[in-house]
Amino acid sequence: MIIFGGVDGTGVWNNDKYAKIFEYSFVRILYNSWTAGPRNYERGPVTADNKLSDYTYFSALRTYRYVLSNWKASESAVFLAGYSRGGAAVIEVAKWLKNKGIPVECLILFDPVDRTGQMGLPWKDTPIADTVKTIVYAKRMKSAKSRESFGNCGLRMWNGERTPYKEFFATHGGLGGVPWTEPKAGGFIDEGPPDFKTRVTVAMDRAGANAVQKWSFDLVMDALLECEERLSEPDGPAKQ
């Protein structure tokens, strides 16, 4: 049994509109296609993170509790996926699970950012727990000039070493599977204040998003197949 917990990215207040926008986000696709065991999906916070029910912290907490409620020692494994602030949420979940003696088989991060005081250590991002076996981390290139007002989180492991990641030329939205559809005239995408124009066109953003999906999903599938094989053995992944 392989448990999946996903937390998606920042979006609009209205849940129906949010669901439509994020219908094909990478976290959502992983959730919808998950057949290896119990699965849970949390929408992301609103921009100001002021919608109580969807606080980044509460999304992380619900994910954590879901894993705990389904975990069976020696029989289970955990895959966590997060986009944008959802990435910060699942990084935190991995740390909380470590404190319960539960490892994370695969941590999937789509351009994670920590723009809330609810996650991480005081004034410092939470590092990746040493109980995470496989990390799939997709990060936007600086040359894309997307969301320059904030950087990424999860860039350091628990031992201080740099987290392995792969960069893609796309916007922050494209990295999460929600690439921009405007402007249709072929100009550079304008993300609005405070960042404004990127160096990415709509076509580039779609191409970048496709590249992220191909790269990350291939790695997730590899990790999933390996985990299923090990889980079928008497000393499954929880014991390794």
Where do the model's predicted regions map?
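Active-site catalytic motif of lipid deacylating hydrolases and related acyltransferases
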Residues: 1-78
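Short secondary-structure boundary/capping segments
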Residues: 17-25, 54-58, 95-96, 121-127, ...
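Structured segments of extracytoplasmic/periplasmic soluble domains
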Residues: 29-33, 66-70, 93-96, 100, ...
